[in-house]
């Protein structure tokens, strides 16, 4: 390994290249989205935990999804806001590796949970009489543990692969946070093992999940089209709309970001960074909105909470 290795030094985050002077203003919409993500996902976790009628597999998966979104957005947004508002550009090597690990691992866990939710829809629609036996709450928790272990095992090697590299030419990351592809590009030594393993891990996790989610919905559509009445078909499809929306919100930006990272060298770096920032916030922001709008129990509890809060404010105002 080259003697110019500075693995125990710091990296410098650029943020949005070429738009450094506008960082202060970019921080406000990002903070707003982060606040919505925190509020929405905390509400989902609270309602699912406290509402006994929601202690069913699909909603337990939704609770897991909300917890993952909270962790994923919190792993990056505080540092991004510190960078944009206080010019806090430095991030230590170990902190960068930790952030990289959490981003990739949590994304893999979320992908697995989305696959589990697709399986839940498949069993509920294609084998409704077996749903309670196949997917009970114990099995749901076990699937959550498998998702955690699977994501951790596949992406734990990434920081180790980065640690073996030597960095000489630059410690400047043209991004707002640390991801494997960008840190790897700064290395002075051969990065082929990193490239091969990174691509393999993504294909074995995200690729496999997308394939089985697609298969699940192929079987669901085939079953639904065989239902005798139009109302039955509409009702069956209606139970899948929320999950399909969440899947698209997660995978479409992820696939677009992966394509840009690997084949978009001619694109302006601004595009890379903005897509990366939006990708980390889009699912956490819209997931609770989608499920809150489509799930009567969640919608009713949220409205009831606001009503109670407003009534207390009115009473307090009347007593003064």
UniProtKB/Swiss-Prot annotation:
Biological processes annotated in GO: adenylate cyclase-activating G protein-coupled receptor signaling pathway; cell migration; cellular response to fatty acid; G protein-coupled receptor signaling pathway; melanocyte differentiation; melanocyte proliferation; positive regulation of blood pressure; positive regulation of renin secretion into blood stream
Topological category with respect to the lipid bilayer: Multi-pass membrane protein
PROSITE patterns: G_PROTEIN_RECEP_F1_1, G_PROTEIN_RECEP_F1_2
Domain of life: Eukaryota
SUPFAM superfamilies tied to this protein: Family A G protein-coupled receptor-like
Pfam families (UniProt xref): 7tm_4
Compartment(s) where it occurs, according to its Swiss-Prot or TrEMBL record: Cell membrane; Early endosome membrane
Side Cytoplasmic, residues: 49-53, 120-141, 222-239, 291-320
Stretches of the chain found on the membrane's Extracellular side: 1-27, 75-98, 163-200, 261-269
Cysteines paired by S-S bonds: 96-178
Tissue-level expression: In brain, expressed in medulla oblongata by cells close to the fourth ventricle, in the area postrema, the nucleus tractus solitarius. Expressed in olfactory epithelium and vomeronasal organ. Expressed in kidney by large renal vessels, renal afferent arterioles, and extrarenal vascular beds. In small resistance vessels the expression is restricted to cells of the juxtaglomerular afferent arteriole, which mediate renin secretion. Also detected in small blood vessels in a variety of tissues including heart, diaphragm, skeletal muscle, and skin.
InterPro entries membership: GPCR_Rhodpsn, GPCR_Rhodpsn_7TM, Olfact_rcpt, OR51/52/56-like
Keyword entries, A-Z: Cell membrane, Disulfide bond, Endosome, G-protein coupled receptor, Glycoprotein, Membrane, Olfaction, Receptor, Sensory transduction, Transducer, Transmembrane, Transmembrane helix
Chain positions carrying an annotated carbohydrate: 5
GO MF term (any one): olfactory receptor activity
One GO term describing the cellular component: membrane
TM region positions: 28-48, 54-74, 99-119, 142-162, 201-221, 240-260, 270-290
Keyword Isomerase set for record: no
Consequence of gene loss (knockout): Knockout mice display reduced baseline blood pressure.
Family as reported in the entry's similarity comment: Belongs to the G-protein coupled receptor 1 family.
Role according to the record: Olfactory receptor. The activity of this receptor is probably mediated by G-proteins which induce elevation of intracellular Ca(2+), cAMP and activation of phosphorylation of the protein kinases PKA and MAPK3/MAPK1. Activation of OR51E2 may affect melanocyte proliferation, differentiation, and melanogenesis and may increase proliferation and migration of primary retinal pigment epithelial (RPE) cells. Activated by the short chain fatty acids (SCFA), acetate and propionate. In response to SCFA, may positively regulate renin secretion and increase blood pressure.
The protein's name in its UniProt record: Olfactory receptor 51E2
Organism: Mus musculus (Mouse)
């Amino acid at each position: 390994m080259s003697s110019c290795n500075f693995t125990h030094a710091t990296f410098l985050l650029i943020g949005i290249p070429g738009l450094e002077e506008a960082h202060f203003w970019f921080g406000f919409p990002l903070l707003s989205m982060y606040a919505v993500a925190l509020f929405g996902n905390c509400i989902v976790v609270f309602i699912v935990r406290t509402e006994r009628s929601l202690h069913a597999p699909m909603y337990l998966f939704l609770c897991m999804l909300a917890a993952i979104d909270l962790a994923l957005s919190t792993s990056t947004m505080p540092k991004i806001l510190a960078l944009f508002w206080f010019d806090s550009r430095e991030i230590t090597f170990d902190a960068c590796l930790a952030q990289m690990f959490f981003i990739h691992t949590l994304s893999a866990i979320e992908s697995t949970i989305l696959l589990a939710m697709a399986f839940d829809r498949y069993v509920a629609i294609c084998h409704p009489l077996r749903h309670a036996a196949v997917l009970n709450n114990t099995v749901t928790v076990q699937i959550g543990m498998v998702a955690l272990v699977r994501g951790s095992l596949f992406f734990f090697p990434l920081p180790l692969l980065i640690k073996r590299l030597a960095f000489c030419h630059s410690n400047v990351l043209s991004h707002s946070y640390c991801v494997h592809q960008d840190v790897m590009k700064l290395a002075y030594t051969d990065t082929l093992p990193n490239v091969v393993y990174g691509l393999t891990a993504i294909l074995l996790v995200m690729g496999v999940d997308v394939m089985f989610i697609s298969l699940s919905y192929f079987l669901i559509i085939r079953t639904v089209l065989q239902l005798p009445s139009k109302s039955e078909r509409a009702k069956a499809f209606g139970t899948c709309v929320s999950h399909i929306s969440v899947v698209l919100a997660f995978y479409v930006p992820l696939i677009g970001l992966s394509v840009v990272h690997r084949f978009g060298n001619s694109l302006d770096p601004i595009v890379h960074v903005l897509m990366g920032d939006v990708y980390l916030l889009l699912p956490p922001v819209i997931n609770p909105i989608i499920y809150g709008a489509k799930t009567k129990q969640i919608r009713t509890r949220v409205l009831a909470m606001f009503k109670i809060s407003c009534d207390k404010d009115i009473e307090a105002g009347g007593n003064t």
